[in-house]
UniProtKB/Swiss-Prot annotation:
Keywords: 2Fe-2S, Amino-acid biosynthesis, Branched-chain amino acid biosynthesis, Iron, Iron-sulfur, Lyase, Magnesium, Metal-binding. Pathway: Amino-acid biosynthesis; L-isoleucine biosynthesis; L-isoleucine from 2-oxobutanoate: step 3/4; Amino-acid biosynthesis; L-valine biosynthesis; L-valine from pyruvate: step 3/4. The keyword Magnesium applies. It comes from Pseudomonas fluorescens (strain SBW25). Functions in the biosynthesis of branched-chain amino acids. Catalyzes the dehydration of (2R,3R)-2,3-dihydroxy-3-methylpentanoate (2,3-dihydroxy-3-methylvalerate) into 2-oxo-3-methylpentanoate (2-oxo-3-methylvalerate) and of (2R)-2,3-dihydroxy-3-methylbutanoate (2,3-dihydroxyisovalerate) into 2-oxo-3-methylbutanoate (2-oxoisovalerate), the penultimate precursor to L-isoleucine and L-valine, respectively. GO terms for biological process: isoleucine biosynthetic process; L-valine biosynthetic process. HAMAP family: IlvD. This is Dihydroxy-acid dehydratase. The modification N6-carboxylysine is found at K124. Its EC number is 4.2.1.9. The active site is at S515. Homodimer.
Length: 613
């Protein structure tokens, strides 16, 4: 049987000093016989997705202690991508993922914790904690803060979210009053932004990986049902500890749950629900921490045969996360995929012996359990609040329409092409990604003129100054992990293209990335990035570029000889922006840039460089 890791600091005469310090935290004699379970919380008043988490760590802690464990809570940082968007603050967002992963490792290993409960929610926090969990490979369970309710206003016929507020603000025809109304209505409650943006996508994928309870990705932050997820997480982590440390059951370890097939399941779900392209970046990073050989080619392979079964904002205005929950949440999407033969159902989870068992219990179209049906009727109250579990509103009915509802069957898919695609070509030899769920079919094949910008800031100025015309392909480069540094999100450029009426008339290509709120022909993660010698750095104004989503290709329409000649010239100049950007790159950001890999590797640290130290 494996010993508790915590015995390192709690047992033996020589650990008297450490035990004295543990006692100073409130531990008693009997506690030294129990597993010490770390609670990695991410409460902060800066982020609406985390503002309600302050007391939830102790809610879990009390349940852990009732179940026979010792709970010790600590906090990680959390960056709000929406607030950091459009200025130098966005340089820090992706690097914060590595800081979060490291901070969890530091706390858990420094104090020899036996297991972890990860209380996450927003864009980089769930991925960072996931990376740490797979790196540490001790019992873990995730429980997120949950999505916010969609916004409501008399001026719009659909639910609102952050992106609506950004688009209307850039629309010169909109009155100040209308902009203010959208601003005040778009984000009414605590929780992660209400569409299938990065935060909600990742919380859903953690369910598919098997590391979270059903409902983790879709139960509203404000709903009282979410409290049960936190309580159950506390009980479950103690049970996982007993199985591993008491019964030598290694099947409960995160690397044995989130194995290669589980990563395929998670990516299959992502493609089926049209999730954020950022999820690709984060799954690739997490796979490396788990030492799993899961890469962009696997994602490309899956994207070619997985249909789109769910369409949610920003891909469609009709549905938000509250509607996904009403339709049965993630296990109903997994159920549709399983019945279509597209899912590995024999894999364990933290709550069921197998995915198949979980689907049988939690898919609303497969179970008659009234408690499950009641759970998925949890809905929005429409009352602005920053308080968790503050309302108990329920829909009168479920959305179990698999022909025309929010979630579809494989036979009635929104499209037989999934919601994400990987493109390759001479402009992105190692690949780039596009969220096809948000691209109008009329522009799945698009040939246009390159309009070059060497920073997000200059592209925004150019778009707002009407420099971009119909038929242009806006290229924003030197915004990758190294070149930014930090691989900024390009939500403002894509939102402003929409506000200018160019959403279906232009494309955008970047070695940066996109917010989960992005839609339109927006292609990111071009690899290698410009700063690493990628061909995106060789494109010139006016060059023709051909994007062909059906054939998964993207090419600069010049000869190989011309491309090679340009590379020779660029090598002489150096791979950096032509003009010096007014951007303060601190020591912290330089350290990230020094080790960062391109997006096709998940923008993680270059371990080969570190192994040589």
């Amino acid at each position: 049987m494996p010993d508790y890791r915590s015995k390192t600091s709690t047992h033996g005469r020589n650990m008297a000093g450490a035990r004295a310090l543990w006692r100073a935290t409130g531990m008693k004699d009997d506690d030294f016989k129990k597993p010490i379970i770390a609670i990695a919380n991410s409460f902060t008043q800066f982020v609406p997705g985390h503002v309600h988490l302050k007391d939830l760590g102790q809610l879990v802690a009390r349940e852990i202690e009732r179940a026979g464990g010792v709970a010790k809570e600590f906090n990680t940082i959390a960056v709000d991508d929406g607030i950091a968007m459009g200025h130098d603050g966005m340089l820090y967002s992706l690097p914060s993922r590595e800081i979060i992963a490291d901070s969890v490792e530091y706390m858990v290993n420094a104090h020899c914790a036996d297991a972890i409960v990860c209380i996450s929610n927003c864009d980089k926090i769930t991925p960072g904690m996931l990376m740490a969990a797979l790196r540490l490979n001790i019992p873990v369970i995730f429980v997120s803060g949950g999505p916010m309710e969609a916004g409501k206003t008399k001026l719009a016929s659909h639910g609102l979210d952050l992106v609506d507020a950004m688009v209307i603000a850039a629309d010169s025809s909109a009155s100040d009053e209308k902009v203010a109304e959208y601003e005040r209505s778009a984000c009414p409650t605590c929780g992660s932004c209400s569409g299938m943006f990065t935060a909600n996508s990742m919380n859903c994928l953690v369910e598919a990986l098997g590391l979270a309870l059903p409902g983790n990705g879709s139960t509203l932050a404000t709903h009282s049902d979410r409290e049960q997820l936190f309580l159950q997480a506390g009980r479950t982590i103690v049970e996982l500890c007993k199985r591993y440390y008491g019964e030598n059951d290694e099947s409960v370890l995160p690397r044995n749950i989130a194995n290669f097939k589980a990563f395929e399941n998670a990516m299959t779900l992502d493609i089926a629900m049209g999730g954020s392209t950022n999820t690709i970046l984060h799954l690739l990073a997490a796979a490396q921490e788990a030492e799993i050989d899961f890469d962009l080619r696997d994602i490309d392979r899956l994207s070619r045969h997985v249909p789109q079964l769910c369409k949610v904002a920003p891909n469609i205005q009709k549905y938000h996360m509250e509607d996904v929950h009403r339709a049965g949440g993630i296990f109903s999407i997994l159920g549709s995929l399983a019945r279509g033969g597209l899912l590995h159902t024999d894999l364990p989870t933290v709550h069921s012996k197998s995915i198949a068992e979980g689907i049988a219990k939690w898919d609303i179209t497969q179970t008659d359990d009234e408690a499950v049906h009641t759970f998925f009727k949890a809905g929005p109250a429409g009352i602005p609040t920053q308080t968790a579990f503050s309302q108990s509103t329920r829909w009168d009915t479920l959305d179990d329409d698999r022909e025309n509802g929010c979630i579809r069957s494989v036979e009635h898919a929104y499209s037989q092409e999934g919601g994400l695609a990987v493109l390759y070509g001479n402009i992105a030899l190692d690949g780039c990604v596009v969220k096809t769920a948000g691209v109008d079919e009329s522009i799945h094949v698009f040939e246009g003129r390159a309009k070059i910008y060497e920073s997000q800031d200059s592209s925004v100025r150019g778009i707002l100054a009407d420099e971009v015309k119909e038929g242009d392909i806006v290229i924003i480069r030197y915004e990758g992990p190294k070149g930014g540094p930090g691989m900024q999100e390009m939500l403002y450029p894509t939102s402003y293209l929409k506000s200018k009426g160019l959403g279906k008339a232009c494309a955008l290509l970047t070695d940066g990335r996109f917010s989960g709120g992005t839609s339109g022909l927006s292609i990111g993660h071009a690899s290698p990035e410009a700063a690493a010698g990628g061909a995106i750095g060789l494109v010139q104004d006016g060059d023709k570029v051909l994007i062909d989503i059906p054939n998964r290709s993207i090419n600069l329409l010049i000869s190989d000889e011309e491309l090679a000649a340009r590379r020779v010239e660029q090598d002489k100049k150096g791979w950096k922006p032509v003009e010096k950007r007014p951007r303060k790159v601190t020591t912290a950001l330089k350290a990230y840039a020094l080790l960062a890999t391109s997006a096709d590797k998940g923008a993680v640290r270059n371990k080969a460089m570190l192994d040589g130290l």
